[in-house]
Amino acid sequence: MTELTISSADISGAIEQYVATFSADPTREEIGIVSDAGDGIAHVEGLPSVMTQELLEFPGGVLGVALNLDERSVGTVVLGDFQDIEEGQQVKRTGEVLSVPVGDAFLGRVINPLGQPIDGRGDIEAETRRALELQAPSVVQRQSVSEPLQTGIKAIDSQTPIGRGQRQLIIGDRKTGKTAVCIDTILNQKQAWETGDPAQQVRCIYVAVGQKGSTVAAVRRTLDEAGALEYTTIVAAPASDAAGFKWLAPYTGSALGQHWMYQGKHVLIVFDDLTKQAEAYRAISLLLRRPPGREAYPGDVFYLHSRLLERCAKLSDELGAGSLTGLPIIETKANDISAYIPTNVISITDGQCFLQTDLFNQGVRPAVNVGVSVSRVGGAAQIKAMKEVAGSLRLELSQYRELEAFAAFASDLDATSKAQLERGARLVELLKQPQNSPYPVEEQVVAIYLGTGGHLDSVPVEDVMRFEQEFLDHVRGSHADILADIRETKKFSEDTETKLTNAVNAFKKSFAATDGSSVEVKGVAAEALDESAVGQETVQVRKPAPKK
């Protein structure tokens, strides 16, 4: 049996070598302890150096955002599954503020508010990351709105036009077509996208907050079937998600849009809807024991929306002249636009389209109430052709609404009032439009000219939509030069008007109303004078009879 020999020289040499190479570089890591957790909120004790909006890591890789920084604890919103978070668990700092990945690879995808794909189509290779809380462009970094963003909806493009960089509020009760208006606007950008010209292309972002999962799936399917998903990103925080996700989703969409805007590109973002975001933020604030204000909303709920919507802008030429156009949606109750959140967002935005339940139930769709709807800056972006043909449209519709209410009580109306009622009824019918069928702007100009130019006065009200569709088909086939001229020059010249009038008159000869009658307007010939009477006309001036 061999004996074990221990060499003291070898041992001392090994120790000396270890000491020589030893590096006393201790790592310092702040560890917090969960003091209580529940309903998507966790209070963490410790972490004295934590920053506001910093990401914290819970066991299992679940992330949270530090919102409340108290003396002894940190109020954290948990992003993800909070069921497994328990009292006594350790929490680590990440040293990073909340950010999301951005880039062109997100087009055509459905993501959650953390930028992670949820459509089952694999990972997304991001170009870079962008912090959610970034300052909006300053005054000198902006320019005034001057380029139109066509929605494809006649009632909006003619009376409340939207420009690139504008914030136009879509407001109304539930089930009045608010989402449909925004989806039609996204679909209408397809023609510009297919040109391949970056100056015309508009990238779209649809942010779904608190919607049903089936509703988000239906929107995605609609966009996919229309070929619009290739230039659209959907940020989804459905009703089943935690309040933290619903609060963050609009900021995620905005960060993605700002990334493209600062590259000189044009972006359209839809927030559907900000009422549910405010409710989620209210829930978070109450759980964090922040003092409630009006309608139990926290004091900074105005700032919640203002700092989000102020990011929509038309950048100056020095910064690339990109734009971010916002369409926030607000849901009202019983058409009450004087409630807290509606008045807040109305004061922040550049105009609003008010959708009314009564109009919707009457079959006027889109149910835009012209009297309350307004666009404060979009008029500067409206093309001249539309301004010319639609200039009198708002006034005529307003007069029609007043007369309509008066006519319900008056049995006898003068000829002028009757003519206004007849014209107004045809204009209302003309502005009706099926869902998911946006109109190119040149066809909108032609259609609205039919109404404001008096060419529909001889067409029965029930035949107006059919007349419009068949006439547009006729113009596309036989008078494509008229549409091309309006599209290219963006003007409605006298020559174009003459051509269009002749085309309408010729088309009326072949169009038959539902009852089989003709809609052609035939002039009434005056009775001819005898030869002896020609040149014998006299003017007689008579004094009034003296008063007795």
Curated annotation (Swiss-Prot):
Indicate whether Membrane appears among the record's keywords. Answer: yes
| Reactions accelerated catalytically | ATP + H2O + 4 H(+)(in) = ADP + phosphate + 5 H(+)(out)
Output the Gene Ontology terms for molecular function. Answer: ADP binding; ATP binding; proton-transporting ATP synthase activity, rotational mechanism
Q: Which InterPro entries does the record match to this protein?
A: ATP_synth_asu-like_sf (IPR023366), ATP_synth_asu_C (IPR000793), ATP_synth_asu_C_sf (IPR038376), ATP_synth_F1_a_nt-bd_dom (IPR033732), ATP_synth_F1_asu (IPR005294), ATPase_a/bsu_AS (IPR020003), ATPase_F1/V1/A1_a/bsu_N (IPR004100), ATPase_F1/V1/A1_a/bsu_N_sf (IPR036121)
Q: Residue numbers for the site described as Required for activity?
A: 373
Q: Which domain of life is it from?
A: Bacteria
Protein topology in the membrane? Peripheral membrane protein
- The entry's protein name is ATP synthase subunit alpha
Provenance organism: Mycobacteroides abscessus (strain ATCC 19977 / DSM 44196 / CCUG 20993 / CIP 104536 / JCM 13569 / NCTC 13031 / TMC 1543 / L948)
Give the gene symbol: atpA
